[in-house]
């Protein structure tokens, strides 16, 4: 039940000791890690993007059957010679040599992006933090490429971007998470509800 459009709290009629709080998906990860939330639903991408010390304080109880999305590396459509990460690595060295700068990668996921690019041997880049509308960055001159979360790929396509053939950084989904501070007790309780 809820008491209004602006109310962030709810309850379950036959479970008065359960309190529901509506939070931003990133906030859920933070609150689970510090123990102020016992259980939360958020994205696997947000857990994996968080610092390792936070990840170590959270248990994945279940992967849920909604919220599917992929974190991908996308380049402008007119980069016809860039189809793979290896091609991107070559371009990054060209940019470094010819412009004396680094390939700029706009992203809301700096940790996952950095880990992915380094694991693929791409080293000549600079991350550009994005707070939203990341797809616009290459066309306003703020970056050459992006990494972003996508479900259908339509927004990328509508903005003249395409995913590299081997540009899948992470397959994400909504997950039911538990704070490790109370994981055994909460896990048993959740099992009794389901």
Give short role names for the model-derived ranges:
Residues 1-194:
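Domain-level signature for soluble enzymes in the chorismate/prephenate branch of the shikimate pathway
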